[in-house]
From Swiss-Prot:
GO molecular function, one term: ATP binding
InterPro entries according to UniProt: Cyt_trans-like, NadD/NMNAT, Rossmann-like_a/b/a_fold
One family name in Pfam for this protein: CTP_transf_like
Entry's family note: Belongs to the NadD family.
Catalytic activity, reaction form: nicotinate beta-D-ribonucleotide + ATP + H(+) = deamido-NAD(+) + diphosphate
Protein name: Probable nicotinate-nucleotide adenylyltransferase
GO biological process: NAD biosynthetic process
Protein's job: Catalyzes the reversible adenylation of nicotinate mononucleotide (NaMN) to nicotinic acid adenine dinucleotide (NaAD).
Catalytic class of the enzyme: transferase
SUPFAM superfamilies xrefs: Nucleotidylyl transferase (SSF52374)
EC number: 2.7.7.18
Pathway where it operates: Cofactor biosynthesis; NAD(+) biosynthesis; deamido-NAD(+) from nicotinate D-ribonucleotide: step 1/1
Amino acid sequence: MNTMNSVLKYKELALYGGSFDPLHKAHLAIIEQTLELLPSAKLIVLPAYQNPFKKPCFLDAQTRFKELERALKGIDRVLLSDFEIKQERAVPTIESVLHFQKLYHPQTLYLVIGADCLRHLSSWTNAKELLKRVELVVFERIGYEEIQFKGHYHPLKGIDAPISSSAIRASLGV
């Protein structure tokens, strides 16, 4: 994992946000495959303080951040950011995109999302503006293979980890 200053040399950035509640092997597979798909990009992993589309998190923000910090240690081209956690509220994706564009001025900014997010992307805050500012990298999710999206995106296929944080929480009875 790298420092914020190491981001400046990259012309391409990718943002991968999420609750990571809890972190699991599919998250790590997405990170690995994003780095392979975008060999010239720096990947910023952005845990949410609170996902605006989900119930309050099971694990607190600092615990989730520390889990990510341990898991990402030593992975080149990955930066873990606490930008959204420091806001102590649900942060719309467009706000994070604007923050990182202003901070680093990348030529290309990718947004890594799951296929399930395409279904309700139009309901996100300033969705049209968001889609003008980013290129989407979309990873497959079981049950969302046939989603229709009228726009360009880079597919991230073959995430061979049919696990979701929701399923893990459900198995724990929370």
